[in-house]
Amino acid sequence: MTKVELAKLRTMIPEMRRVRRIHFIGIGGAGMGGIAEVLANEGYQVTGSDLARNAVTERLASLGAHIFVGHSAEHVSEASVVVVSTAIKQDNPELLAARELRIPVVRRAEMLAELMRFRHGIAIAGTHGKTTTTSLVASIYAEADRDPTFVIGGLLNSAGTNARLGSSRYLIAEADESDASFLHLQPMVSIVTNIEADHMETYGGDFSKLKATFIDFLHNLPFYGLAVVCVDDPVIRGMLPEIARPTITYGLSDDADVQVLDFVQTSNRSCFRVRRKDAGELAVTLNLPGIHNALNAAAAIAVATEDGIGDDAIICALAKFEGVGRRFQQYGEFETGRGKAMLVDDYGHHPSEVKVTINAARTGWPDKRLVMVFQPHRYTRTRDLYEDFSDVLSKVDVLVMLEVYAAGEEPIPGADGRALCRSIRSRGSLEPIFAATPDDVPAILADLIGEGDLVLTQGAGNVGALSRRLGEMKLSIDSMKSGA
């Protein structure tokens, strides 16, 4: 992209000409890093700090961002504005310094809202499926030569990044309900995939407040905007009479405006028909497993069809979709020394997400023994969904349970990995194996895996790094025993 094109894009946020340097506290997260990348490509000076370097910070550094390891008050001294992630605590030295220096402090969603303000925003919200649905929408728009800007909460494999600055008016982004900050967004189109109890501490434990917040999010649309919602979800179906915006529904239900029919999965690929209320039927091949991903594709199809994107671009984008990092990411099938075993990694950390991942594995590879390495994420979530976790985790063949990934929370008695193991064991169908740390897992797996196994690492914490390590070991029993 030329400097002239970049200068033109800068005029889309004219009042931000006063801004010279933007500092991100917690820049290594996918959501924060994505916004930082777009701003860096727009020509702003971007700095940021995090506790450690990772792939996100390395990419940003390659784009000219200055990355600090660790947090220090001096890092914000030259900043025009400071952006904070939800993970940053109030006693963070950079946050305290910014406030003392009267530097504006905004949340991630507020900065995303500024990027979206003068663009045609497409925002994807929901408890599950946001990242994949956002990726599918972005892929279709790219295939149709709409050249969108996108900000995704995971790595879009085909682009090699989770964010990109496009030259068109389109901005496609995830909308995060975890802290209700998605209410800052003013999109033209909003997708809501589903609504379940999660992040309830934000909503005072009141599910009706969570539902009301999603309705407020949809009512941030202009009166001529578009809400695209999954009618299969009972909460969304119940909310429909309260949504006072133009609405398109999608789902498996017969009354859906965009309906998924005749779903068939073979290994990693899914085939199905899509009946559209005001357009022709589509025969779709999706390069993703699981009927839940067919529904995610239906949402993307609904948006693209409404925006006049041709069927050829839709069909082509879905057929060649290369997936998203840590969303049923397949590392391959390896000769372990005791037969071949397959390694898959998935980010899902809510019982409903774990359930659909298990179903996708069972449907695509019905003859394989399912060996899951599960890492619970947050003590509050483990406590609030304890029975649901116990039920769904009982459905695998072999379970290795890690300790809860705290994500900054304090431990809660009775809501940890050992307690979950006891609960699952009491159901009588499975004998879980507890692993105190991820470093203990390779040796445990070396004694477990055999011919035809599907090893599935599951969770939102550092279990993803464990999966990469297992992939580097190629699930070799000798390598896992030695830790090499």
UniProtKB/Swiss-Prot annotation:
It is found in: Cytoplasm. GO terms for cellular component: cytoplasm. It comes from the Bacteria. Pathway: Cell wall biogenesis; peptidoglycan biosynthesis. GO terms for molecular function: ATP binding; UDP-N-acetylmuramate-L-alanine ligase activity. ATP binds at residues 126-132. Keywords: ATP-binding, Cell cycle, Cell division, Cell shape, Cell wall biogenesis/degradation, Cytoplasm, Ligase, Nucleotide-binding, Peptidoglycan synthesis. It catalyses: UDP-N-acetyl-alpha-D-muramate + L-alanine + ATP = UDP-N-acetyl-alpha-D-muramoyl-L-alanine + ADP + phosphate + H(+). Belongs to the MurCDEF family. NCBIfam families: murC. This is UDP-N-acetylmuramate--L-alanine ligase. It comes from Aeromonas salmonicida (strain A449).
